[in-house]
Structures are given as C-alpha cells and as structure tokens.
C-alpha cells in the first residue's frame, strides 16, 4: 500500500498481481512518461475492479463508482481511502494538463457495464458496440497521445480505430467468460449466423479497424512508433 502522498513513480513500482494486468509502462515508453502511464492505468484498473470484481450488488458498484468520480473531480490531492490511486493521478493531471473528461468517460463505461449486466441488456448492432468503445477504449488512446503531445484530428481518429479494434477483439475472445456473467458483447442483429461464421466476420471488421489506425505509428515519436 502506498502512502497518502504517493508519487507517480511509486505507482509504477507496484508489483503487478492482477490477472488481467499487462506491462503498461514498458520499455517502449520513454522514461519520463512511464510514471504518468502507470498512474492512468492504476486509475482504470481500480475502477474496473469496482465494476467487475467481487460480489457487490449493482447498486453498491454504482455507488462506489460515484465516489470514485468525486475523487477524480476533486481539485486537491486525495486524502481518502483511494489516496494511493488519486494522489499520483492528480499530480499527473496537473503536470500534463491531462483532460479529466477522458478519465470520466472511462467511469461512464464502467457504469454502463454494471447497468447492462444487472439488466441483462444486449447491444442491438455493431454501431452500438462501437459507441460503447468510445467510452471504454478510445479515451485510453487519446490520453496516451496527449502525453506524447500528439493532438491532431487525424491522429486521434486513427487512435480511436485501434482502440476500438482492441476492445472488440477483447470482447470476442472472452465470450466464454462474459456470457455466463450476464455480459453480451455480440451485435444482436447478426446472431442469426452460426457462431464461428459470426466471430470470423466480426474479427474481420476489427482487423479492418486496426489497419485504418495502423499509420498512427508514423506519428508517435520514439520506440512507441516506427
């Protein structure tokens, strides 16, 4: 556990123990950005755990996410139970003028997930899934581009395409886990197809999105690009 005055570099140094973790602050990232990326990831990971882990009711999860949002929107460093997350995050927000609205979009996605799971809701078509990706995935790419100082409209569109593709791929590789938990990430207007053919078609669409975003690597400096 970090102290209440934890610094971004201390978040970066935390051991990775969550089963869905991945090396977010890898050698591909310049050293001066790694603590910021780690702080953003710690925020997203903690919010995801509120929405997805444990045995809380939907009402309890939504209440916890609301409290999490209050911490995010606070103008001073956190001194509450989530100080290990928000103290370094607030420093990063100030240092890089990070758009808080993008972080809030992630919370909106988690709230949408909680409500959809509780209601057994489905997504009527691929457009609805892509709208969800605008909240759940695309903000992450835009936050990273902001750290790199890449803000032009074309770069943001390419980033959105890549992030949406990655989110869709994640949905479809986890169907066997999500469906028993009441989460349905298949477009309902296409489910009349046999499942293997449906997944093949959906993955082809995700590949198309990924290729639309691929030229972004030429706009990102350093090892993260080409």
Language-model segment annotations:
Residues 1-221:
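Acidic catalytic motifs of isoprenoid enzymes
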Residues 223-226:
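Amphipathic alpha-helical protein-interaction segments enriched in hydrophobic
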């Amino acid at each position: 556990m970090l102290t209440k005055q934890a610094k971004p570099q201390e978040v970066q140094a935390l051991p990775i123990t969550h089963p869905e973790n991945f090396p977010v602050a890898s050698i591909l990232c310049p050293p001066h950005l790694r603590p910021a990326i780690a702080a953003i990831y710690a925020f997203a990971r903690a919010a995801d755990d509120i929405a997805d882990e444990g045995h809380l009711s939907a009402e309890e999860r939504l209440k916890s996410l609301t409290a999490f949002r209050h911490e995010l929107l606070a103008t001073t460093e956190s001194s509450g139970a989530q100080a290990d997350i928000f103290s370094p995050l607030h420093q990063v927000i100030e240092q890089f003028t990070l758009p808080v609205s993008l972080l809030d979009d992630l919370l909106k996605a988690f709230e949408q997930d909680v409500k959809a799971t509780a209601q057994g809701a489905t997504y009527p078509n691929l457009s609805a899934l892509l709208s969800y990706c605008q909240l759940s995935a695309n903000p992450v790419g835009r936050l990273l581009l902001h750290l790199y100082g890449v803000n032009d409209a074309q770069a943001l569109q390419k980033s959105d395409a890549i992030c949406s593709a990655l989110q869709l791929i994640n949905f479809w590789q986890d169907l066997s886990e999500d469906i028993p938990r009441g989460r349905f990430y298949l477009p309902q207007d296409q489910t009349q197809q046999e499942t293997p053919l449906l997944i093949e078609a959906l993955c082809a669409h995700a590949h198309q999105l990924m290729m639309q975003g691929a030229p972004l690597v030429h706009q990102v400096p350093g090892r993260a690009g080409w």
